[in-house]
Structure formats: structure tokens, C-alpha cells
Amino acid sequence: DNSYKVSGGLHGVGVSVVNALSSKLQLTIHRAGQEHQQEYHHGDPQYPLRVIGETDRTGTIVRFWPSAETFSQTIFNVDILARRLRELSFLNAGVRIVLRDERVNLENVYDYEGGLSEFVRYINEGKTHLNEIFHFTTDADNGISVEVALQWNDSYQENVRCFTNNIPQKDGGTHLAGFRAALTRGLNSYMENENLLKKEKVVVSGDDAREGLTAIISVKVPDPKFSSQTKEKLVSSEVKPAVEQAMNKEFSAYLLENPQAAKSIAGKIIDAARARDAARKAREMTRRKSALDIAGLPGKLADCQEKDPALSELYLVEGDSAGGSAKQGRNRKMQAILPLKGKILNVERARFDKMISSQEVGTLITALGCGIGREEYNPDKLRYHKII
């Protein structure tokens, strides 16, 4: 009962390594009414632990000076420290952390009573949110504590951060797997019960459900197992069912108790599914009709003989009759002609799937050769460096 319930690893290793790599390390311990102190130089104790006074405080102060013999640079980056300390304050609601940079007389205080809710709010600052922040904490029977906070916004990126015993896992792990499984199941169940999938004629995926999602997953595990010493991925098998069970229960209740938020979230997911399907069709179209294979294009394009994009020109003309005149008057060596119908579509205001279903827009995309969508678009493949 006198030891920590959870920790990131072997507690003594961290301070031992810091001690060995420091020209000086000083420990001050306030305990049982006495103040103790010990000092080390390059890892060697200068004197035994000794009592230097009385105190009514409790806690330990560790001061260290990185060794210039070991490190070529011993200057601390305050931005890196600030980011990590702010993160720790979010993860431990009510813990007050003070960062002082005595080089420039700077002091930052991190104290977030809202914990993970404030973490999500901080990340989503400046974005339009679709729902109020959903936040819960629960303790499993096997000693695993699960805390989750999430909110959807109007962006198209997923931003999910995972932590085990306050340590970040950039590669996720079993806690992320449990979270994703429960999230997708809960949303699919809600949309099926509301008959939204049949009504909208879409098939949604887990990626659709997480578009625009900001979430923090924090678990406290008595004996965590990681894939490597850097602890970038959690592999403890017992964590997945603990997170999945807790998330299933809490998130399903949230959707039922907040119908307006659930409707907004479902609407965004359906839009994401449509856009994903449209992007898939666009990729298939551009692959079938390779920009280098003009036979794959509709017969409207009269291409030029020049293959160097820097010397090639593309003229977009309105209608077939104008196209005929342009073809007669062009320089075949460097000028290509593509007739299009007038006012084909205002793509700025059209949804992605409607835009890509336009034959004229599809013809233009294929003729230019750059592809479409975040993954496929490549401006270096533009076939004409002058477009008129």
C-alpha cells in the first residue's frame, strides 16, 4: 500500500540515468517533519543523505545540471517543456504545475480542473464543434482506470491521442483499438436504429466515423506492457476489453440522451461516407483514363504534339462549335483544345460527390493529369503549364 498503484516503468531508472549524465544533481526531501539532502557530481555521492532542518512540507525536489562533457548542448527548450507540462496538467485534473524560466523571467502556471475536457477544448480552439464535449471516467474490476473525452468539429482530420499512466503512445495500441471498436459500433447501432443508413443509401466505415473527431484516451494500468522501450505502443491485452466495455456503455447512453448532438454527428459521418465514395470513384476514373493515355479521354480533347508540360498550352473553349474553330486555328505542336459546356458547375458550392459526378469536371480533371483528392492529387503531374 505504500507504493504507487501505477507508474510508467521502473521508478529508479529515470533518476539514475539523469544523475549519471549530470555534472551535479541535488536531492531535497521533505518527509516526516524533517528536510533531508544529498548531492551528486557525475553520479558520485558527495556525502551521505543528511538532515538539514525541520519542515512541515511533504515532497521531493530534484535539481540537476546537464553535463557539458556528455552533451554538446545543455540549453533547455522551454517550448518542449511547456507542451509536456501542459499535457500532464490536462491528464491529472486539479494538479497545479508551475514552469519558471529564470533566463527570461517567465512563469507559466498549468492548472486544469476540467482535465481531459479542457484538453479537448484546447485542441479544438478556433474550430466549429458539432457536439458538447463527451467525457467519462470509470474504474474496471481488474484495476484498470479508463478516461475518455471527445468532440467532433467541422474539420476533416482525425486527432486522437492515447496515454497510459500519463505516457503518450503515438502509435496507439490496445486502448486505441478498444476505443475505435466501441465508437464505430455505437454510431452504427444508432444510425441503424434511426434508419439513417437505408434512408441515405450509404455504407459507413470507421474512418468516416472519425472524420473531424478530437479525442483523448487515458488509461491507468497497474502493470502496462509496451512494444518497445520507448513505450510508443501499448500491447497489454487486458486493456482493449476494459476500454471497449466502458466506451460501449457510456457512449451509447450519450447518443440516446443527446439526440441533437447524435443527429449532427451522424450527418457528418454520412457526408464523409459520400465524399469517400466519390473520391474512390474519382481515383478509379483517373486510373482508368490515365493522363498519359489520351485514348482514355473523351474524344473532345485535341491534344498537342509537345510532351514537355512547360512548353504545352491547354485552351478551354465553350461548346463544340467554338472547339472546331479553335482546332483549325491552333498551333498543333504546342496548343491543345478542350471544348466544354458553358457554366458546367460551381464547384466551390457543390458537394464533392456532386462535383465528381459531372462529366465535364471529370473530363477536365483527367485532361490536366494531376489527380484528385488528398491522397491522389499531385501538381507535379500537370500536363500543361499554361491553361487559358
Swiss-Prot record:
Q: What is the enzyme's class at the highest EC level? A: isomerase
Matches recorded under InterPro entries: HATPase_C_sf, Ribosomal_Su5_D2-typ_SF, Ribsml_uS5_D2-typ_fold_subgr, Topo_IIA, Topo_IIA-like_dom_sf, Topo_IIA_B, Topo_IIA_B_C, Topo_IIA_bsu_dom2
- Highest classification ranks of the organism: Bacteria, Pseudomonadati, Pseudomonadota, Gammaproteobacteria, Moraxellales
Q: Which GO terms describe its cellular component?
A: cytoplasm
The chain positions of domain Toprim read 312-388
Its name, as the record gives it, is: DNA gyrase subunit B
Q: Which UniProt keywords apply?
A: ATP-binding, Cytoplasm, DNA-binding, Isomerase, Nucleotide-binding, Topoisomerase
Record function comment: A type II topoisomerase that negatively supercoils closed circular double-stranded (ds) DNA in an ATP-dependent manner to modulate DNA topology and maintain chromosomes in an underwound state. Negative supercoiling favors strand separation, and DNA replication, transcription, recombination and repair, all of which involve strand separation. Also able to catalyze the interconversion of other topological isomers of dsDNA rings, including catenanes and knotted rings. Type II topoisomerases break and join 2 DNA strands simultaneously in an ATP-dependent manner.
Q: Matching CDD domains, A to Z?
A: TopoII_Trans_DNA_gyrase
Q: What else is known?
A: Few gyrases are as efficient as E.coli at forming negative supercoils. Not all organisms have 2 type II topoisomerases; in organisms with a single type II topoisomerase this enzyme also has to decatenate newly replicated chromosomes.
Picking any one GO biological process from the record gives: DNA topological change
Assembly information from the UniProt record: Heterotetramer, composed of two GyrA and two GyrB chains. In the heterotetramer, GyrA contains the active site tyrosine that forms a transient covalent intermediate with DNA, while GyrB binds cofactors and catalyzes ATP hydrolysis.
Assigned protein family:
Belongs to the type II topoisomerase GyrB family.
Organism equals Acinetobacter haemolyticus
Q: What is its main location?
A: cytoplasm
Compartmental location:
Cytoplasm
